[in-house]
A protein has these predicted regions:
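C-terminal lobe and pocket-closing loops
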Residues: 299-307, 323-329, 337-440, 478-479
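Hinge/lid segment of periplasmic solute-binding proteins
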Residues: 116-169, 313-316
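Extracytoplasmic/periplasmic solute-binding protein
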Residues: 155-163, 168, 193-250, 278, ...
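C-terminal motif of bacterial Sec signal peptides marking the signal peptidase cleavage site
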Residues: 18-21
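Extracytoplasmic "Venus flytrap"/periplasmic binding protein-like
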Residues: 75-143, 178-181, 280-281, 285-289, ...
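Short, well-ordered beta-strand elements
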Residues: 47-65, 83-88, 110-111, 159, ...
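Short, low-complexity, disordered segments immediately C-terminal to signal peptides
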Residues: 23-50
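Glycine-centered hinge/linker elements that transmit conformational signals in sensory
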Residues: 237-272, 313, 317-320
């Protein structure tokens, strides 16, 4: 009888565990949706294999600052004295070609970044499967929510991971706003507020323009307005260019033609407006907003701008008017371990150390503060990139290295849901851009729209169908 009761109790307990587990697994937040539609992990049920104690050598290649790479390599070797890290230096121009040449001779680095088009890396079988390590690593729970599920290109295997993060940044000239007696927007500004401000800050009689672009409205609008997980309205399953992309393309075109957008570099219009066709509009003091990237923070602190009375301050890309997320476009560099590496476990640890681990970031912060060039000057005038993890100590450490201004506090608080651009994150995307978006029957779609040759709304459905077709064909070609 006791044995029977014990068995019944055991069965009941097991049933309870199964029910609770299933209930827990069914609760998935929007932030857990992958760019490929979602990826579950079993971190609680797996353990990372031990690192080898053998004497081994790992090679590493990225286009990050070489002195920083060497500093991190030295710190990694201090932690693992049995591992030698060799840095492979390549020119960033033609990066993927250089990797192709190395791979052809069996010398693909154990850990490497690939540039732009992920199809090249997949087609050439460069990407090693790190699923076993990534899914079992408890450190990865601290990754920024939108960074956890990228890199599962076939929906199953972790083939790449985010290694570097520069957010899209909208710079506002605070002095110009003050000059025109226009109040600076809230750090929680919305997309429509940005569009309205561009028009309000355009003063033709004073030769003042609302904005200038490096980054684009057509990239921002679908991500922030559709709570998308990628460019062109990518929702984890498909693209949609029929709404916000088309609206943004037409809006930008109207602004170019009406003088809200500053004259383009090296044009007759720039010559007429600034007296120098080669003068960057952002350095004239006559542009209210510069749509750009985080790496420009340091440039805008240079005397070229300060001495002209230009005070560029950073804002995050505004939130969509009806958005439920803080998703914002970002330049994300992706890293991978080589499919040919003899030491995948150790290569994974090296990739993480250089990319997103807290320990690696602690060393990065120290490097930003202390590394000097041959003349004794600091190599980094400001931190290079933002953390890929949530750890507040790391964010606080980075904040301490930035100017003492509330704009930086406001920015960092709202820059923790980056969305990577398509080429490096989505199979088929770059091929679609090359063959359709910039080189298809419409020519350069954005240029044709700006010139009034096509209406973005008229071609958006065709572009949507082709974008989804290119993705499907890429998945079939690359994985099946």
């Amino acid at each position: 009888m006791l044995r029977k009761n014990w068995l019944l109790l055991l069965l009941a307990t097991l049933l309870l565990v199964v029910v609770v587990g299933c209930s827990s697994d069914s609760e998935v937040s929007d932030d857990d949706k992958a760019n490929e539609g979602g990826k579950e992990t079993d971190q609680d049920q797996q353990e990372l294999p031990e690192m080898t104690e053998e004497e081994i050598t790992l090679s590493y290649a990225s286009w990050a600052n070489h002195e920083l790479n060497q500093y991190l390599a030295d710190r990694f070797m201090e932690k693992y004295p049995n591992i030698t890290v060799e840095l492979v230096q390549l020119e960033q121009e033609g990066w993927n070609d250089h990797l192709t040449n190395l791979a052809s001779t069996g010398e693909l680095p154990d850990v490497f970044w690939y540039l732009g088009n992920v199809d090249i890396a997949i087609r050439n079988a460069w990407l090693g499967d790190m699923t076993e390590y990534f899914n079992a690593d408890p450190e990865n729970e601290d990754l920024l929510d939108t960074m956890k599920d990228v890199g599962y290109f076939d929906g199953e295997r972790k083939l790449a991971a985010p290694a570097n993060y520069y957010p899209y940044t909208v710079f506002l000239d605070e002095n110009l706003f003050e000059q025109l007696n226009v109040e600076m927007p809230s750090p929680d500004w919305t997309y429509s507020e940005m569009i309205d401000l561009m028009q309000k800050m355009t003063v033709p009689e004073q030769g003042i323009y609302g904005y200038n672009t490096f980054t684009k409205l057509v990239t921002m609008a679908p991500i922030v307005n559709q709570d998308a997980f990628g460019e062109f309205g990518w929702d984890g399953e498909s693209y949609d260019l029929t709404t916000d992309w088309a609206d943004a393309a037409m809006q930008h075109s109207e602004f170019v033609r009406s003088g809200v957008h500053a004259p383009f570099f090296d044009t007759d219009e720039a010559e007429a407006a600034f007296g120098d066709r080669l003068l960057w509009a952002a350095s004239t003091g006559r542009v209210a907003m510069q749509l750009d990237a985080w790496w420009t923070v340091g440039l805008f602190a240079e005397p070229e701008f300060v001495d002209k009375g230009i005070k560029w301050v950073p804002y995050v890309v505004p939130k969509g008017d009806n958005a439920s997320t803080e998703n914002k476009p970002a330049f994300i560099d992706f890293g991978a371990i080589s499919s040919a590496t003899e030491y995948p476990r150790e290569a994974y640890e090296l990739l993480k150390f250089f990319g997103w681990s807290k320990e690696g970031w602690e060393h990065k912060l120290e490097a930003f503060k202390t590394l000097q060039d041959d003349t004794g000057n600091l190599i980094f005038q400001h931190p290079d990139g933002l953390p890929l993890i949530k750890d507040q100590e790391i964010w606080d450490g980075l904040r301490a290295l930035l100017p003492d201004s509330h704009y930086y506090d406001d920015f960092l608080q709202r820059a923790k849901h980056p969305i990577p651009l398509g080429g490096a994150a989505q199979p088929g995307f770059q091929t679609f851009l090359d063959e359709v978006y910039f080189g298809g029957e419409y020519g350069d779609v954005e240029l044709a729209t700006a010139n009034g040759e096509v209406n973005a709304h008229d071609i958006a459905q065709d572009l949507t169908e082709k974008a989804n077709q290119y993705r499907e064909e890429a998945i079939e070609e690359l994985f099946y």
